[in-house]
């Protein structure tokens, strides 16, 4: 096993020696030091708020060489929400490189493509360092794609150093730098704040979209009507037009409905009784949540569909409209890309919600709705199944974990194979049902025009739920310090 990599059963494994090649680079990369003593809850809240403030400030800073007025934002709304990004700003790529690096490596380890014992502190440090290198590399790669493909328009009126090529290179460097800043900001929040910086940035982006969609008093089209739905409804009511006020509030109503359904689904679970084999009378319960794979499937499915849209735009601009042709607003107007693209939000549709209904309640509109829905739900189920099988969440892996902990299901032999057969009755079913459910819910939110998009709402509810749990745990540990020591 002295080779850097080897082949077993047609699978390529990377071992420690292969990753050790990157150790000199890992050693010189800046790292956020761990706190000398655990921060108090108050300090964690301060750090969290400071991180949020920096995130919002970065979203308002545009790179030198980019004219903010030329940036097209509308068609990238879903991408911004998923990646915690702001098109055209320093955080155009958002957390995309960080998330992609994490997903690639976790799937590689789970699928045994990388042979690495992460319980070993040295291996874990090496893995995290390599993940950081990959995230930095992806930051530059994505920045180059955004600039060279024309998604981020370069200001051609005053090229830097008199060269468009130099301007593009400088803009790409600034975009990559923005993602790297978010990478280290995430590291700061993980060690000094509450929860994960990545989750916080996504939730902040969705919350901002919800707030502006509901309460913005600025007109989107330059007219007298405010773009915020609440102000629109109030203006219609003042004019005696109650019906139009109802239509204006409809996306907000659907947002609340989707939010409540997700909150309810988060609490649905099956609890399997367990007992300790060596200690009779002591028992526990193993919860299998209905959303067993959380919102991971719909994130990956949405990312695939968004990449189809971006790839279609890139090919169309290159004179190869294989996936479809694109209109002046950089939105697909036909082809595969058109049918796999979410419908335009009622907020951006001429005539508001009534105009939106007039668009979708046609043969072409219905075909678009169901083609997009079928693709989103099918991909969600596929990714849900793949995620369970590749990340150690399948029946066999869970049964092995319970066996190592000395836990068994009462009334059955203490044999991992028996536990596996029992888990096989539940895990595959709830994986398919849960992944399909989040896909359908995201599709429903998209076609009804819910603010923040369906995927964004699903993400935010899950993130806020875990944020609340972390906050409550921190508060308990501060009140009872001995409990923290016992659990550690």
Question: Language-model segments: what does each one mean?
Answer:
Residues 5-488:
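Core subunits and conserved enzymes of cellular information-processing
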